[in-house]
Every structure is written in C-alpha cells, then in structure tokens.
C-alpha cells in the first residue's frame, strides 16, 4: 500500500503551485513522440476522461482543489513523485525545474492494481531536458500531447445524456 502524505506547504510553495505550469510527458525510447499518458487512457474508463483532463488543466492553472494534490512517499522509487487524484483517477507526475513538471502517466485505482501501477509509473523514463534545446523540444511535444489528450477526451468521453 502506498502511503499518501498530506502536503504541508510553505507560503512560497503554495504561491509557486498557483503559478501557471508547463508540462512535459514521459515517453518510451521506442516511440519518443508518443506520450505514455495517451496509451494509458486506453485502460481508463470513459466516464473518467473528463476528470483526467480537468485535473491536468486545473494543475496547469494552479486551481486544484484541496486534497487533489498528494506527495508519494512510502517507496524509495517514488520519492519526489506526486499525484493528482480525484475519485479513482490518479495522475502521477514529478517536478523537473522551475514551473516545469513531467506527467508520468494516469491510471484508475483499484484494489488489485494499487502497488503495480505505482511501480509501473516509477519505472517510466523522465525525458532528458539537460539542454535548452532538449527542454524546448519536450515542451513542444508537451503542447502536442495536451492537444491529443483534449481531442481524445472530446471524441471518447461518455456524454451525460444519451
């Protein structure tokens, strides 16, 4: 079981989290232009698609509700990782630098996948942003991924009335 730690933030940290953020996304070496989160969405039930997009958009703009943001702490591999959560949705991410965060992936929490999914997320590659050029490329891919995710949600989400 993963321990979730309530974040006790300093005023400065709180202010930083409310600033606009930029996202990059974990990919694989085999396909460095396809973000893992897009593939992860295949295993997320359609009724949670809006939640995934809303959590991410609120995070970017610094408007997440209390309790939606948690640090992960129980496992050495997960040190430094955080999650956005609402209902069963978990979006795992890591702060890279300044206002840049790496989204590792998304899953829906179930009793039988808890540890496995956190381990999977912890083992994913964090993109190389050691140079300005690499960082800019990742930020560009991040914008493309956000558009792909938005389009995916628009097409596949479950409508409230049928």
What are these language model-derived features?
Residues 1-88, 96-101, 107-162:
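Basic, Lys/Arg-enriched alpha-helical interface segments
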